[in-house]
Amino acid sequence: MTSGFALDVRNWTETLGWQPSPQQQQQFEALYHGIIAGNQRLNLTRITDPAEFTEKHLWDSLYGLRPLLTDDWSGEIIDIGTGGGFPGLPAAIALTKSRVMLLDSTRKKIQFLQTLAQELGLSNVTVAVGRAEEWGRDRRQRARYDWATIRAVGPATVCAEYCLPLLKIGGKAVLYRGQWTEEEAIALDRAVTILGGEVVDVSATFLPESGAERHCITLQKTAQTPAAYPRMVGLPSQKPLG
């Protein structure tokens, strides 16, 4: 494929503590081409430059999952509001023994991602059309997952209400943010206490090429989430906790 797509493997080794295999590098490139092709009919991403895509979709997705990259990890992840498949698809490529559920409320996007995952040979990916509020109240999904990821979905307090009900006790959620303020941190602490969790890590970094600021907020579920949460569809965003 001749698209200018290239991974700075040395940089990834230094910043992520992990190096993709040649097969994984091919899958990342195929993911790029698949997303660009799908972007012609679906609003998947505004990022189409290969170098920017590599930094802001691939590297950024994996930065929040650094603890899993060197651990030969084999748990179950749910990517909530996956949109164009980030961070779920990069996670599925990197974590070959994991199982990744891509959840989104837009059927056309989910149908596209299902086809793309098959084209990439990702047998560890499943997809579903749904809302996090509904899934968090479904007995088959509630308290099921080891990790949850959520990026570009809404305020951190809302993301916490989407994620924590779906996690097992001891499970973790990664909230991908840009800037992070003290006001947001205080509100999130209040919300996760209500939901049966705690904030266990706030990792600040800068993207390796553009220098854009990023924060990954890691939550851990420490107790069963009260049955009242998540609230009905729309309420978490209309009346955020915290």
Swiss-Prot record:
Enzyme class: transferase
Organism: Synechococcus elongatus (strain ATCC 33912 / PCC 7942 / FACHB-805) (Anacystis nidulans R2)
Family the entry assigns: Belongs to the methyltransferase superfamily. RNA methyltransferase RsmG family.
Binding site for S-adenosyl-L-methionine: G81, F86, D104, S105, T106, A132, E133, R151
The protein's name in its UniProt record: Ribosomal RNA small subunit methyltransferase G
GO molecular function annotations of the record: rRNA (guanine-N7-)-methyltransferase activity
HAMAP family: 16SrRNA_methyltr_G
Job of this protein: Specifically methylates the N7 position of a guanine in 16S rRNA.
Assigned EC number: 2.1.1.-
Keywords in alphabetical order: Cytoplasm, Methyltransferase, rRNA processing, S-adenosyl-L-methionine, Transferase
Predominant location category: cytoplasm
One GO cellular component, as annotated: cytosol
InterPro entries named among the record's database cross-references: rRNA_ssu_MeTfrase_G, SAM-dependent_MTases_sf
Subcellular location: Cytoplasm
